């Protein structure tokens, strides 16, 4: 997205930019024909320090359950294990800020999912959560009556997206979700990646737990879905 350059003549403060490559090998990528539209209000990239309104390559996207727009599937990850009877989740500050923005945009609590096993390499489940507040490094939820490992995914619930509609922001595609007034706005997504060999070290919000990795790969390559990815790791 192009932006008007504001200010007086002269040298402005420099801004850095680093290319990102998420595909491996020389095989041609496969894109969803015709592209799609991203929900600018409900999308963001908490991993992009200082620029959460810009989606980076490696961001996993999915079609919302209603409205036909695409948004990022994973909001962030927990930074501490969740213990039964807790009413909070511990996350990074950027993740808490993004969830707080979603709550403000909705004007109410947001329905999300906490995806992970109760212990390392255990059975993964997507547990529905309602986040009523987010501040600092804390998300406020109700007691879940279960446990989850640290690094569990905070993502859209099953009722919030269309199964089999996953795609990924491709190499060097940095998608600015803000308009000229810095307000969030829907944006074109002309190259939704739905096939190729992926460097998992470059996929944003990629989990560390082996069973969660397997679970997420299953979502990306769901039977009957539109995507068909290969991964460079053996898991």
Per-region residue spans from a language model:
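Surface-exposed, low-hydrophobicity beta-strand/loop segments enriched in small/polar/acidic residues
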Residues: 1-235
